[in-house]
C-alpha cells in the first residue's frame, strides 16, 4: 500500500520536492523547486535501515556494467539551467547522469546505476551547484588558492608570477619563461587554472610566443600601456589563435577616450574587466561599453554591492595596488578620478538588469579572492530589497534572479574563456567540479567541494573526536587535496597552440591540459541570463548614469546578509 506523509516530513527525510521553497542563507532570496527527477516511493538514501543496500537500492552491477563511481542523492540543484531536485551520478571525474538513481533490477526508470563499487554522498536537504570560476586573478601569492577553494571556487584564470610589482598591479604572466614556471607550480594545487599573457604590444611576435607557450588568454592593462595600437594588435593575434582578451582601459585618457578604445576594438570580442571603473578604465565613462554586443562586461568584487563603506576603503586600496604615492598630487588625482559613488551605485542595478554579465575578484589587487560568491549573493539580496521582484519571474519565488546571478560566476565566465564544454554548469559530460551547501550557509561556507569527482575539502570537526562533527568544525583539506590525486583531479587550461606543441610533455606537467576553444565567435548575446545591451550614458561632470535614458541610482546598503554572523569564529 502506498504511504502518505506530510510535506514537512518528506522534506526532512528526502529533501524538498516540487513546489517546496527554500531560503538562501540569511538573505531574502527564496527559491522554489521547479521539478523533481526522483521517483516518489523509490527514492534512494544511504544509511542504516535505508535504501542503498545490497539487493535493494544497490544492484550487483560492476563498473564495467555501468555502475557509477559516486552518487549524490536527492540534491537540490541550483544552476543556470534551472532549480530542481535530482540524483547525480559521477564517473571518471565527470557528471555521468542526472535523474533517478537506484537498482534497475528492482526499480523502474533508473538513470543512474548504483553498484557495490559506488560511493554515496547524501544530498538530502542540501544545495548542489557547479564550482565557481574566478576569471580575474592576480597570482600574487599561492595562499590565495586555498582561500578561493574554501569559498567554492574551483577554477581560476589570470596572470602573475608572485609579488613582483608587475603582478601586484596587472593580471599578466609575461613571457614564455614565466608562463612555463607558473604552469609547473600550478600542478601542485587542487584547482583548475589558466594563465593570461601580457597583451600590451604593437607588434604580434611576442604575443604569439606567449600563446604558443600556453597562455590561454591575453590581458591588456593600462599600467603597461593600453593604447589603440596595442588593443588592435592584441585582438588581431587573439582572433588568429582563438584566445580571449581581457582589457583594463586607460583611466587617464592619455592615449584616447572610451570612444577611441571602442573604435580600436573594431567589433571584436573582448572581456572588459571592472567595467564600472573603480578598478580602472576610462574615467568617468568606461561603463558605456556595457551596451555593445562584442563587449563581455565583468565586475570585480570590492564595489559589489554598494555599501556605506565602499568609497572610504577604495582610495587607499587603489594607491597600494597601482604603486602610487600620496605625496604626488598627480597620483592622488589619478586615484580620486576612479572612485565615483554614482557609477558604483549604477553597477548594482546594471547587474540586476542582466547588463553586466560576470563577477570576479581581482585578487589582492583591489579584490578579495574568497568573496566572489558571497558578494554576488549580497548584491542579489540588496537588489531584491531595493528593486523588488524582477519582471522575468514567473512564480512566487526568486528563481530567475537566482539563475541570473549564479550564471555570473559559473557559466558566463566559462563561455567567455572558451571552457564551457568542461565547466560552468551541472550538465552531463562536464567535469564534476561541484559544491554541496547547507542552505543555511549557502554562498558563505560550502559543506563539501569536489574536483573531478574527488572530495578536496569539506567542513570537518575535531580529527581526534569519536565522530566527525565535534567542534571546532571548519573547512579542512581532504584526501583529494594531497598526493597524486591533485594532478589527476584538476586540469590546466591552455591555448590550442600550446596544446598542439605538447607543452604538457615539454614542461613535465602532471595535470591534464585542456585547450580553450570558441573564444572569438561569441558576444554579449552568448551570456546566459545576462545579455542586456542598454545604451549607457555617464554625465561627464555629475557622473550620473542613465541606461536607455533612465537614471540608475540606489542607496548604499547599511547592513548585509552573509556577513558577520557567519564569521564570529
UniProtKB/Swiss-Prot annotation:
PTM-bearing positions, type N6-carboxylysine: 219
Keywords tagged on the record: Cytoplasm, Hydrolase, Metal-binding, Nickel
Any single GO BP term: urea catabolic process
List of catalytic residues: 322 (proton donor)
Residue ranges the record marks as coiled coil: none
Binding site for Ni(2+) 1: 136, 138, 219, 362
Pathway(s) of this molecule: Nitrogen metabolism; urea degradation; CO(2) and NH(3) from urea (urease route): step 1/1
Pfam families given in the database record: Amidohydro_1, Urease_alpha
Cofactor note text: Binds 2 nickel ions per subunit.
Catalysed reaction, written as an equation: urea + 2 H2O + H(+) = hydrogencarbonate + 2 NH4(+)
Protein location: Cytoplasm
Residues binding substrate, per UniProt: 221
Family membership noted in the UniProt record: Belongs to the metallo-dependent hydrolases superfamily. Urease alpha subunit family.
Name recorded for this polypeptide: Urease subunit alpha
Taxon lineage: Bacteria, Pseudomonadati, Pseudomonadota, Alphaproteobacteria, Rhodobacterales
Name of the gene encoding the protein in the UniProt record: ureC
Amino acid at each position: 500500500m502506498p504511504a502518505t506523509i506530510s510535506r514537512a516530513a518528506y522534506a526532512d527525510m528526502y529533501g524538498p520536492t516540487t513546489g517546496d521553497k527554500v531560503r538562501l542563507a540569511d538573505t531574502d532570496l527564496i527559491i522554489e523547486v521547479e521539478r523533481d527527477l526522483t521517483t516518489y516511493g523509490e527514492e534512494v538514501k544511504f544509511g542504516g535501515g535505508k535504501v542503498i543496500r545490497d539487493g535493494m537500492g544497490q544492484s550487483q552491477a560492476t563498473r564495467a556494467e555501468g555502475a557509477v563511481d559516486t552518487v549524490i542523492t536527492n540534491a537540490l540543484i541550483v544552476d543556470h539551467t534551472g532549480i530542481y531536485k535530482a540524483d547525480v551520478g559521477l564517473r571518471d571525474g565527470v557528471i555521468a547522469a542526472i535523474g533517478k538513481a537506484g537498482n534497475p533490477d528492482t526499480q523502474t526508470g533508473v538513470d543512474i546505476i548504483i553498484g557495490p563499487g559506488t560511493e554515496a554522498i547524501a544530498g538530502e536537504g542540501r544545495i548542489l551547484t557547479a564550482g565557481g570560476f574566478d576569471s580575474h586573478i592576480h597570482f600574487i601569492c599561492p595562499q590565495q588558492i586555498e582561500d578561493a577553494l574554501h569559498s567554492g571556487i574551483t577554477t581560476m584564470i589570470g596572470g602573475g608570477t608572485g609579488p613582483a610589482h608587475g603582478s601586484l598591479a596587472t593580471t599578466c604572466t609575461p613571457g614564455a619563461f614565466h608562463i612555463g614556471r607558473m604552469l609547473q607550480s600550478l600542478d601542485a594545487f587542487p584547482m583548475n587554472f589558466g594563465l593570461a599573457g601580457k597583451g600590451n604590444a604593437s607588434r604580434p611576435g611576442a604575443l604569439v610566443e606567449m600563446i604558443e607557450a600556453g597562455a590561454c588568454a591575453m590581458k591588456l592593462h593600462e599600467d603597461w600601456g593600453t593604447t589603440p595600437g596595442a588593443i588592435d594588435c592584441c585582438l588581431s593575434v587573439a582572433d588568429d589563435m582563438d584566445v580571449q582578451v581581457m582589457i583594463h582601459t586607460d583611466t587617464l585618457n592619455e592615449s584616447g577616450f572610451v570612444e577611441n578604445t571602442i573604435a580600436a576594438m573594431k567589433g571584436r570580442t573582448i572581456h572588459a574587466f571592472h567595467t564600472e571603473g573603480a578598478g580602472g578604465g576610462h574615467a568617468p565613462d568606461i561603463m558605456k561599453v556595457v551596451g555593445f554586443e562584442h563587449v563581455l562586461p565583468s565586475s570585480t568584487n570590492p564595489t559589489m554591492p554598494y555599501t556605506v563603506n565602499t568609497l572610504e576603503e577604495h582610495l587607499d586600496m587603489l594607491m597600494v595596488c597601482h604603486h602610487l604615492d600620496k605625496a604626488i598630487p598627480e597620483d592622488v588625482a589619478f586615484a580620486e578620478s576612479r572612485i565615483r559613488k554614482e557609477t558604483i551605485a549604477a553597477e548594482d542595478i546594471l547587474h540586476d538588469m542582466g547588463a553586466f554579465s560576470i563577477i570576479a575578484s581581482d585578487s589582492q589587487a583591489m579584490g578579495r579572492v574568497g568573496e566572489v560568491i558571497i558578494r554576488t549573493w549580497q548584491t542579489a539580496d540588496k537588489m531584491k530589497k531595493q528593486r523588488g521582484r524582477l519582471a522575468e519571474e514567473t512564480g512566487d519565488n526568486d528563481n530567475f534572479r537566482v539563475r541570473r546571478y549564479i550564471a555570473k560566476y559559473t557559466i558566463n565566465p566559462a563561455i567567455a574563456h572558451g571552457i564551457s564544454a568542461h565547466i560552468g554548469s551541472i550538465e552531463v559530460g562536464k567535469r564534476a567540479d561541484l559544491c554541496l551547501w547547507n542552505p543555511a550557509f549557502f554562498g558563505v561556507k560550502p559543506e563539501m567541494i569536489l574536483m573531478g569527482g574527488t572530495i578536496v575539502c569539506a567542513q570537518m570537526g575535531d580529527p581526534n573526536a569519536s565522530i566527525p562533527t565535534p567542534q571546532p568544525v571548519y573547512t579542512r583539506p581532504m584526501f583529494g587535496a594531497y598526493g597524486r590525486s591533485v594532478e589527476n583531479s584538476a586540469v590546466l587550461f591552455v591555448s590550442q597552440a600550446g596544446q598542439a606543441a605538447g607543452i604538457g610533455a615539454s614542461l613535465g606537467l602532471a595535470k591534464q591540459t585542456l585547450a580553450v576553444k570558441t573564444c572569438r565567435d561569441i558576444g554579449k548575446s552568448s551570456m546566459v541570463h545576462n545579455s542586456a545591451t542598454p545604451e549607457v550614458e555617464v554625465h561627464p561632470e555629475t557622473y550620473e548614469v542613465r541606461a536607455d535614458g533612465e537614471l540608475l541610482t540606489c542607496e548604499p546598503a547599511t547592513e548585509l546578509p552573509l556577513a558577520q554572523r557567519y564569521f564570529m569564529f
